[in-house]
């Protein structure tokens, strides 16, 4: 027996809804998205707004504290220590269509007869088709977001500023969140940077990272939570650090240590934070060869509390089922997200690159 258009729409929507909320099939093609995972782990939804997501930024103590004698006149001032940083929010969409002819070629019949019930074979065949399409839409959505959110936002009039703008290789120029980084007095709004680091001398790269780490922790004592790197930077640091492995010791209840429990962790670490390789940085280098700062030679020291993904409430990776239009025998499924991305404390982050 065939499917009705409503049955097909319901099956498509429910399948996508289930797929998005559960682990996908084992994937052999798509690359990892550690940057997107970082953003999603600390995302902060917003209620909606006309055009911008606004953050309150404390920029100065505007202090007038001074010594005074027994009957000296003292002063008071009207402190102006808050500014607002405004970041654009926008929308992304990914969708697929299935024509009734395409479905029929796969043994699935669609009819307007409301009394029909699909056969077991049709259910299995439709499930196979939907699984493939839903995996593509979900993975495509993630790949698009991970890639685009590394860029500076100039790639499209609808794009939001990404990491290349928020943690910039030229932090003394440009406007971020409506605050001009080039203006005297706005130094607080600049991230740290060290590019063109020579790796010819052993220990030089590690020393540069030590200095940048210290800069990141200067204001408020907040340490970077994540270090994302391209493959060339990772290889350079691995050689410079001579494959150093951090070791963790677990304290037992009796106060003794037990090296046998989680005695060591694999990977390459700096200050206890693992250097995470971002494949998309290598992909960006392949897509934009000859960039002023090679993408695969970069290292980002980030603070996930201060680098924010702000989806509109209930609008992150939403499965959609647009109705079939009257003059097309085509059925649609989609996924949309509405969000912005901002930064609230650039001076806790740094971008480095090797020569």
Residue ranges and their predicted role:
Residues 2-355:
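Flexible, glycine/threonine- and acidic-rich loop/arm segments that mediate assembly and lattice contacts
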């Amino acid at each position: 027996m065939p499917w009705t258009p409503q049955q097909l729409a319901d099956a498509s929507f429910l399948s996508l809804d289930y797929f998005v909320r559960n682990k996908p099939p084992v994937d052999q093609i798509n690359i990892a998205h550690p940057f997107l995972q970082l953003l999603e782990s600390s995302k902060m939804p917003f209620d909606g707004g006309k055009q911008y997501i606004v953050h309150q930024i404390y920029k100065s103590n505007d202090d007038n504290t001074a010594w005074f004698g027994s009957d000296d006149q003292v002063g008071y001032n009207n402190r102006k220590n808050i500014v607002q940083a405004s970041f654009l929010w926008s929308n992304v969409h990914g969708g697929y269509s299935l024509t009734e002819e395409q479905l029929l070629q796969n043994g699935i019949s669609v009819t307007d007869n409301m009394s029909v019930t699909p056969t077991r074979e049709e259910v299995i065949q439709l499930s196979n088709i939907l699984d493939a399409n839903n995996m593509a839409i979900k993975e495509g959505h993630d790949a698009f977001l991970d890639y685009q959110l590394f860029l500076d936002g100039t790639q499209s009039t609808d794009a939001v500023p990404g990491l290349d703008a928020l943690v910039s290789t030229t932090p003394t120029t440009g406007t971020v969140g409506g605050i001009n980084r080039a203006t005297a007095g706005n130094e607080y709004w600049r991230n740290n940077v060290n590019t063109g680091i020579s790796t010819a001398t052993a220990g030089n790269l590690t020393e540069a990272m030590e200095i940048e780490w210290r800069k990141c922790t200067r204001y408020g004592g907040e340490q970077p939570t994540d270090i994302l790197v391209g493959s060339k930077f990772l290889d350079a640091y691995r050689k410079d650090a001579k494959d150093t492995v951090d070791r963790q010791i677990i304290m037992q209840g009796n106060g003794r240590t037990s090296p046998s429990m989680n005695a060591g962790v694999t990977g390459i670490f700096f200050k206890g934070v693992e250097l995470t390789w971002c494949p998309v940085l290598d992909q960006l280098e392949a897509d934009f060869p000859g960039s002023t700062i090679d993408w695969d030679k970069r290292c980002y020291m980030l603070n996930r509390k201060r680098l924010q993904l702000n989806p509109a409430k209930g609008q992150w990776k939403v499965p959609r089922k647009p109705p079939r239009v009257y003059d097309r025998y085509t059925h649609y499924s989609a996924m949309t997200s509405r969000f912005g991305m901002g930064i609230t404390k650039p001076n806790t982050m740094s971008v480095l690159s090797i020569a």
